[in-house]
Amino acid sequence: IFINVKCSLPQQCLRPCKDRFGQHAGGKCINGKCKCYP
């Protein structure tokens, strides 16, 4: 699931993804945007 958060590193996506989808969520940075894996 893509969220509207800009990124340049995967680590930048972990916190926003966890905030939205819970502690077990993961995140990657794809084409400058965060993609969450709930």
Curated annotation (Swiss-Prot):
Gene Ontology CC entries for this record: extracellular region
Entry annotated with the keyword Acyltransferase: no
UniProt main location, coarse: secreted
Entry annotated with the keyword Secreted: yes
Disulfide bond entries: C7-C29, C13-C34, C17-C36
UniProtKB keywords: Disulfide bond, Ion channel impairing toxin, Neurotoxin, Potassium channel impairing toxin, Secreted, Toxin, Voltage-gated potassium channel impairing toxin
Organism domain of life: Eukaryota
Localization: Secreted
Site (Basic residue of the functional dyad): K28
GO molecular function: ion channel inhibitor activity; potassium channel regulator activity; toxin activity
UniProt-annotated site: Aromatic residue of the functional dyad, residues: Y37
Tissue: Expressed by the venom gland.
Swiss-Prot/TrEMBL domain comment: Has the structural arrangement of an alpha-helix connected to a beta-sheet by disulfide bonds (CSalpha/beta).
UniProt family annotation: Belongs to the short scorpion toxin superfamily. Potassium channel inhibitor family. Alpha-KTx 02 subfamily.
Described purpose of this protein according to its UniProt entry: Weakly blocks Kv1.3/KCNA3 voltage-gated potassium channels (Kd is estimated to be 366 nM).
Record protein name field: Potassium channel toxin alpha-KTx 2.10
Lineage: Eukaryota, Metazoa, Ecdysozoa, Arthropoda, Chelicerata
